């Protein structure tokens, strides 16, 4: 099974593409990293234009990698000046995935860290080591 994982944002959308072999169990040997990177939007453009960039680049990733499903990081609301823009970018991601008919599962950052490191409060450096 091929999975496209997405960490949405307006300035940067992180992504990773993995193949998972369900018959190999839960360890890292059951997963093969195919691609990962960041979709960066032009900060000089309007929010609407940046969302178009996200949708365009995400469509290209889907066409190239042909994932069976997608995983999108859940967003928690907190007081920040960019909260609305991030939520809007997340909406563009979900809309694009849905247009391609991809099943979507959502995980909190804590759930992702727990699965990677065994510690839901791990910092990003420790999480990267496990990736």
Regions found by a protein language model. Give the residues of each.
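Phosphate- and other anionic-substrate recognition elements at nucleic-acid/protein interfaces
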Residues: 1-128
